[in-house]
């Protein structure tokens, strides 16, 4: 089993548990160059809020899009957008990525901006 298959297996298991809870989830995806975050409704069919380093507004705030500072900017932006839509509590879905570095920075930034998880 390669690295990507292992990550997807971990992500599937976590998503199954979150679905059983029926919770709105904050999903994180990372690539070497970008970080993406979405708040997805409990039924899984609607994206309530989203932010990523691909967006021009966030790219202008940061020097490089693939580092911890960029992840913090994405976390703050997605939390603010979710709170505007009335979502304050979410389950954190790290998509099988290790809770470390950019993933942890995004989560901490979203918490500081007012999102509860």
Curated annotation (Swiss-Prot):
It comes from the Bacteria. GO terms for molecular function: 5S rRNA binding; structural constituent of ribosome. Gene3D superfamilies: 3.30.420.100. InterPro entries: Ribosomal_uL18_bac-type (IPR004389), Ribosomal_uL18_bac/euk (IPR005484). GO terms for cellular component: cytosolic large ribosomal subunit. It holds the Pfam family Ribosomal_L18p. Belongs to the universal ribosomal protein uL18 family. This is one of the proteins that bind and probably mediate the attachment of the 5S RNA into the large ribosomal subunit, where it forms part of the central protuberance. NCBIfam families: L18_bact. This is Large ribosomal subunit protein uL18. It comes from Vibrio vulnificus (strain YJ016).
